[in-house]
């Protein structure tokens, strides 16, 4: 892999992660300028030649929508500057929960975002823990889908937890949690929840035994933390010795930090796909920079990506 043939650039949302990725790749972060105007619009420019280069653009697309618009403009500018290939590295893919038409007269946001990226000129997407695997099929370009388990599972192994039980906070996440349980060689329990409205859990029941166990709840993301904290409190009340949680994406919006801090959770472990500034003492973040750097290296060297997946 020659650093002369590729360059890494970043939007403003995840510059910290792009810098760490570059450290692992042994290359400098490319020089781009994002100028924001008084009316809220912004313009993108590359301050060095990218002609004929393989370009990797690191940008998570968590709210607000400016982060997605930045990425689209970065792609467009790279295409117009004659980059050889344009690879969008999107650690957290926003709008992924809008992946199906679950009621009449609604949009399918994930499909629209995939179309926008393709029209802008992206050649490849590298992302992590999509809310629904089928979103990969929304794209007309290759998608390398990584998993946060690549850093979370080794962390759990190092803890060497006795009487371990893996839990899924809902039936929909049972496949993900079951993979963790198989890898760690421990039982799986499920939570069955019902919602009255978005971000609000009406009721929840445990399917399985947690009495005297150390429970780790597995999810893909935590938004308002209503589900994960309710599950932790119910499991603690059912006799669990300790309750932890692990999720790839630290959305943590609204009351999430207070809910986690005041819950039965001992800790909640995320990756650094999204920056977290509201410092809740129970939140820990593990870096996925090395995993993304290794994926970029394999893309450049035409090596298998799937062989590094743990889930």
Describe these PLM feature segments.
Residues 1-311:
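PRPP-associated nucleotide enzymes
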């Amino acid at each position: 892999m020659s650093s002369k043939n590729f360059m890494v650039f970043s939007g403003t949302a995840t510059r910290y992660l792009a810098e760490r990725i570059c450290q692992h790749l042994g290359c400098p972060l490319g020089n781009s300028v994002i100028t924001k105007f008084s009316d809220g619009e912004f313009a993108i420019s590359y301050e060095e030649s990218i002609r004929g280069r393989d370009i990797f653009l690191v940008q998570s697309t968590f709210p607000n929508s400016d982060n997605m618009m930045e990425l689209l403009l970065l792609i467009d500018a790279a295409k117009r500057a004659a980059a050889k290939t344009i690879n969008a590295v999107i650690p957290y893919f926003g709008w992924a929960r809008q992946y199906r038409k679950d009621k009449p007269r609604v949009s399918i946001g994930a499909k629209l975002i995939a179309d926008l990226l393709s029209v802008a000129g992206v050649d490849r997407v590298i992302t992590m823990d999509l809310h629904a695997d089928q979103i990969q099929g929304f794209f007309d370009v290759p998608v390398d889908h990584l998993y946060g388990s690549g850093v979370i599972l080794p962390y759990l192994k190092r803890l060497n937890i006795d009487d371990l039980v893996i839990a899924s906070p809902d039936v929909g996440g049972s496949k993900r949690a079951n993979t963790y349980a198989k890898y760690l060689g421990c039982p799986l329990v499920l939570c069955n929840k019902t919602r009255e409205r978005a971000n609000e859990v009406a009721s929840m029941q445990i399917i399985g035994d947690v009495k005297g166990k150390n429970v780790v709840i597995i999810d893909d993301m935590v938004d308002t933390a209503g589900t994960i904290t309710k599950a932790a409190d119910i499991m603690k009340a059912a006799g669990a010795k300790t309750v932890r949680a692990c999720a790839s994406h630290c959305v943590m919006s609204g009351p999430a930090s207070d809910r986690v801090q005041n819950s039965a959770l001992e800790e909640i472990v995320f990756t650094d796909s999204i920056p977290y500034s509201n410092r809740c003492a129970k939140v820990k973040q593990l870096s996925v920079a090395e995993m993304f750097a290794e994926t970029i290296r394999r893309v450049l060297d035409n090596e298998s990506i799937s062989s590094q997946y743990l889930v």
